Amino acid sequence: MACLLEAPLRISVLSEVTATSRHYVDRLFDPDPQNVLQGVIDMKNAVIGNNKQKANLIVLGAVPRLLYLLQQSSSTLELRTECAVVLGSLSMGTENNIKSLVDCHIIPALLQGLLCSDLIFIEACLRCLRTVFISPVTPVQLLYTDPTVIPHLMSLLSRSQHTQEYITQIFAHCCKTPEHQTVLFNHGAIQNIAPLLISPSYKVRMQALKCFSVLAYENAQVSMTLVNVLVDGEQLSQVFVRMMQRDKPIEMQLTAAKCLTYMCRAGAIRTEDNCIVLKTLPCLVRMCSKERLLEERVEGAETLAYLMEPDIELQRIASVTDHLVSMLADYFKYPSSVSAITDIKRLDHDLKHAHELRQAAFKLYASLGSNDEDIRKKITETENMMDRIVSGLSESSIKVRLAAVRCLHSLSRSVQQLRTSFHDHAVWKPLMKLLQNAPDEVLVMASSTLCNLLLEFSPSKEPILESGVIELLCSLTQSDSSALRVNGIWALMNMAFQADQKVKVEIVRALGTEQLFRLLSDPDTNVLMKTLGLLRNLLSTRPHIDQIMSSHGKQIMQAVTLILEGEHSIEVKEQTLCILANIADGNTAKELIMTDDDMLQKIKYYMGHSNVKLQLAATFCISNLIWNEEDGSQERQDKLREMGFVDILHKLTQASDPDLCDRAKTAMQQYLA
């Protein structure tokens, strides 16, 4: 019987709750304005801390009525203010609540309310707007829809500490793109917000600081302007340095360090400046220590990784600051063993941040080890480091996988590591698995790493070859992403270097001549350069040159002609002439050049070019064609003499460039022998 009674009981309780909520909404429609005001005040008291009540009132249609009352010119200022306060309270509920408020067009209504002159009403509207805008479900673009909004918000900054706090918080949350940065910059964000950094209110100082961190991120224009800003006679960078002092709240230290990091990365502060080397870097290393909260350690590590990414000196300094390399190993120890955690909340917290910690540690290791051999050695010798990277490659979190492969890529730049750690841990296996099915950003990093693993001195090259990687790499060359096409062809180029004939034939077969020639006309110069590099490596020993040219000679000569005639860089043309020199070294392949007078004229033209690199490559080509010890050399020498090549060679023996002069003399000796 109890089961039968339960349902009706539930319904009656629900009806009661709904009836109470309905009563609040009904009072908003009372014809007596005084009753309406009292109804709004009672509603305000009823919803404080009561998410269920908030949801009920939203479902029952309270929001459109509150917005109507807020916008009515006939409403008293007190009523309008109370409506804004209730809406602010409703917005502090769940994400669904905020979605409903946004759908009811709360944002334009509140922005309109800011045109009122009454400060208390303005503050109530701003407080609600702040809560709505900092929610992840609110489209930030809504702040920028009406072009008059940003300048009006700037003008309200001087009204009170509350307007300063709410407006800077809105800006800090809604500045997500370079376009947003530009809008705020153009409307005077820097000069309006800078004085707030010395406000007596901590909240105002903090939000102003956050504003500068999002404005300066990857923005040279903002960063260059910030360097010259004075706040109460003090340079802004020095204000940030003061905010990083150990006695300041961690949130402030971290955000100030971010501001200086972003200004440095944007080129506004030199990496060797004291405020970076002696202040920002040590502050960020401190943020990585065990004493800090997990989320602070994540932010500290990621910011530090970004700061030193392009600078080898900062990497070296960081690697010997506070045992950073071993300190980061601790990032992998979360969540702690379950038995040691009695607090379930703590376990939940650790689990939530474990992925982020691993991701941050991998990013920082990648940045630390991107240039210096000793640092890479230090990283790989850290406890279980290679095992951690390997397991990171197969984590469920895509961000951790990306950070792990980025770390692996950084370490793979080391010849020593490729020969030792990478081989010992068979890193190529999980890497190949990752390449089978991953988003493009992971594929780009994984294929870059694979390029390094396929270098001729890498012990991983052989097992990778045997695993059927050629087909995979050929498929990458057909990608829409130019970065993936570059990496696919680059890996094939490394694979073809000093490879045996079997591998070369397999590459040509798998790639297909059509695709090879498509890559030779790729709009991306990097793709073209690597494809030429592949071709040069394929055509590298006489039997290989003759075999490939016997089956694909016509198309290769055609491609060479097109490139030499086209609008290409010196590097591209030099690489193409080197391919021609390789063809000229073949036993039978050289006839493809000798029977092509048009090609010979092109070589002649490049021997007289203003660029020494092109002259060298073209002269090398002729040198190979007239080499004495080969069959038919006399006929070739005679033909080239008739075409005027000897006169050019003679002239080049007087060249100012010693290499060109030597190469021309070597060629001339073939005629004298």
From Swiss-Prot:
Gene3D superfamilies: Leucine-rich Repeat Variant (1.25.10.10). ARM repeats lie at residues 51-92, 95-134, 138-176, 178-217, 225-265, 269-309, 313-352, 374-413, 416-455, 458-497, 501-540, 543-585, 588-627, 634-673. GO terms for cellular component: cytoplasm; GID complex; nucleus; ubiquitin ligase complex. GO terms for biological process: animal organ development; proteasome-mediated ubiquitin-dependent protein catabolic process. Keywords: Cytoplasm, Nucleus, Repeat. Component of the CTLH E3 ubiquitin-protein ligase complex that mediates ubiquitination and subsequent proteasomal degradation of target proteins. This is Armadillo repeat-containing protein 8.
